[in-house]
């Protein structure tokens, strides 16, 4: 029968695997306690970094529906369960490993798919959520600025058009009134020879 503490540990790991947006497996052999504290601090609230036994991790992963981690569960293993920005945490682990070669990225899991070490490092090369949002906000701001310039230009163009029309009207009133005056005049008719002859007969 399994010990209650192991059952509880497996249940906790399973829940973390299931709820995490991604999980990165690392080897921490030789890292000091202070170095591990620094690593946890650098990851911030976006990830939970925990040491776990390979046997319990393997069971928990399978219960969470994750297959294919056996090759990564060799040697001392610590897992970074990411609940925030995946790219940011992956970048933090990659940078920490550069400064502390004793930390080795083994691989990971994302969306139920097992990743190798290179794939995890590629995640670190992606732009973080904050950077993407900043770029999006910058793009929207630029578009709004362009729209504002266009809308502000419309009234001024109309005003310039009216001003030009007023100047023309002052110089030549027919620009505005010509059409109206023409409409008040009676239309001229042209008499045909037959009509003239008929008029002459009547007069006789």
Curated annotation (Swiss-Prot):
Pfam family, one: Ribosomal_L10
InterPro entries, alphabetized: Ribosomal_uL10, Ribosomal_uL10-like_sf, Ribosomal_uL10_bac, Ribosomal_uL10_bac_type, Ribosomal_uL10_CS_bac
Disordered: annotated span: 170-204
Polar residues biased stretches: 192-204
Superkingdom in the source lineage: Bacteria
Keywords: Ribonucleoprotein, Ribosomal protein, RNA-binding, rRNA-binding
Molecular-function annotations in GO: large ribosomal subunit rRNA binding; structural constituent of ribosome
Classification via PROSITE patterns: RIBOSOMAL_L10
CC annotations in GO: large ribosomal subunit
Keyword Ribosomal protein among record annotations: yes
Family per record: Belongs to the universal ribosomal protein uL10 family.
Function according to Swiss-Prot or TrEMBL: Forms part of the ribosomal stalk, playing a central role in the interaction of the ribosome with GTP-bound translation factors.
Subunit structure and binding partners: Part of the ribosomal stalk of the 50S ribosomal subunit. The N-terminus interacts with L11 and the large rRNA to form the base of the stalk. The C-terminus forms an elongated spine to which L12 dimers bind in a sequential fashion forming a multimeric L10(L12)X complex.
Protein name: Large ribosomal subunit protein uL10
Organism: Cutibacterium acnes (strain DSM 16379 / KPA171202)
Lineage of producing organism: Bacteria, Bacillati, Actinomycetota, Actinomycetes, Propionibacteriales
